[in-house]
Amino acid sequence: MRILITNDDGINAPGLETLEAIATEVAGPAGEVWTVAPAFEQSGVAHCISYVHPTLIAELGPRRFAAEGTPADCVLAAIADVMRDNPPDLVLSGVNRGNNSGENVMYSGTVGGAMEAALQGLPAIALSQYMGSRTAVLDDPFQAARMHGPRLIRQLLDYGDWTSDEDFRLFYNINFPPCDAGSVKGTRVAPQGRRQGVRFEVEPYHAPNGRRFLWVLGGSQTAEATPESDVDANMRDYISLTPMRPDLTCHKTLAELRGVLEEG
């Protein structure tokens, strides 16, 4: 098996090292793990692609590349250039330092990398490690992902469904709870949730030279979540697994609007 890995925290992020270990275990002795990851942190870029300027790419070692672009750029660089003659069988994006559940999905570069792979027709999984007070005291805050990740990926590969009921390929979003590996209670297949109390804030800053800047600050990640959602599962020490597709259509409203607005 040939696996491509990327992330949004950057080529030197500890979560990418965790993902390399996970991918190596899944690929097996005869497999290959290729890394094409951002040269610099790209958190919060979602599914952005850098088509307005070229992307500098550097080979750092055998099957290891850094691109000055987003996770989606990295996936495209791998498919169109680095791995053009031998495309990946699976794309893994992560392991993100922090959860990508709930509304975080919409901002996540980690999810964006997996989504781009799905749009390119490849099986893809995004992996994120929820962080909190219990992971902060661990020598390896990614240990839940490191221990449980290979098993979940194998289960999804065995399940083998990468198509949806529409024209889009599925990809999967996995979030590991904010606890040590031994405290994980199991896995819950859950929908994307919503935390009503989470809001971004903008803080102004005036530089000594008179220029005015704005810092975008994230809200609390512990606000009450939609019951039985991905966030809810994580807060109860379960791994959440959410099947997703690159389609934002609200099909319920689509059907209703057709009856109201369409003529002829």
From Swiss-Prot:
**Gene Ontology CC terms:** cytoplasm
Give the enzyme class: hydrolase
Enzyme Commission number(s) from the entry: 3.1.3.5
Cofactor annotation: a divalent metal cation
CC cofactor note: Binds 1 divalent metal cation per subunit.
Q: A single GO molecular function, which one? A: exopolyphosphatase activity
Q: Where does a divalent metal cation bind?
A: D8, D9, S43, N96
Query: Where in the cell does this protein reside?
Result: Cytoplasm
Write the record's keywords in alphabetical order, separated by commas.
Answer: Cytoplasm, Hydrolase, Metal-binding, Nucleotide-binding
Q: Which reaction is recorded as catalysed by this protein?
A: a ribonucleoside 5'-phosphate + H2O = a ribonucleoside + phosphate
Q: Which InterPro entries match?
A: SurE, SurE-like_Pase/nucleotidase, SurE-like_sf
What this chain does, per the record?
Nucleotidase that shows phosphatase activity on nucleoside 5'-monophosphates.
Task: Return the similarity comment.
Answer: Belongs to the SurE nucleotidase family.
Family matches, as HAMAP family? SurE
Q: Name the chain's protein.
A: 5'-nucleotidase SurE
Write down the species: Paracoccus denitrificans (strain Pd 1222)
